[in-house]
């Protein structure tokens, strides 16, 4: 398996859109069904400072994505927020772990980020386990955090500090 974690390129945008068009990736994120290519092009062709979009490429195909966003407030520049998705067909193969390793390396060894935050639905045990494996702890739970498939879902706030 030749897995590469790298910064995204503009030609990755259709593959990133396809990741979030998958049922599991949609259910685990805040993305809406049927994501448009135009929306993803707008989002990823105008990446602001402090945002580092990463992709996981397996044998030439983009199969995962992680957004790493450093807080804009000067008093919180030591904090980053992450969100990630892995194509349904490639879940359970270590893609999420590889993306997380790269994000932590970027945070701690290059950007002086000492706190990484994320939000995860409480009914996503695989993602919660992944984050806990990398030292994330649940700091709280938001009731009715999002609306998905006709009902409200709760989410955990998780963070990792060094």
Regions found by a protein language model. Name each.
Residues 7-11, 23, 29-89, 100-102, ...:
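Acetyl-CoA-dependent GNAT
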């Amino acid at each position: 398996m030749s897995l590469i974690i790298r910064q995204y390129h503009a030609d990755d945008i259709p593959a990133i859109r396809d990741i979030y068009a998958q049922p599991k990736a949609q259910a685990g994120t805040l993305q809406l069904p049927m994501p448009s290519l135009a929306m993803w092009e707008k989002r990823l062709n105008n990446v602001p400072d402090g945002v580092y979009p990463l992709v996981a490429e397996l044998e030439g195909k983009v199969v995962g994505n992680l957004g790493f966003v450093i807080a804009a407030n000067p008093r919180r520049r030591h904090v980053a927020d992450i969100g990630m998705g892995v194509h349904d067909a490639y879940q359970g193969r270590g893609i999420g772990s590889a993306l997380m390793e790269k994000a932590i390396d970027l945070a701690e060894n290059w950007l002086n980020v000492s706190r990484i935050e994320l939000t995860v639905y409480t009914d996503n045990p695989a993602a919660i386990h992944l984050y806990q494996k990398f030292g994330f702890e649940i700091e709280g739970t938001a009731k009715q955090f999002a609306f998905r498939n006709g009902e409200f879902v709760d989410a955990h706030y998780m963070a990792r500090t060094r």
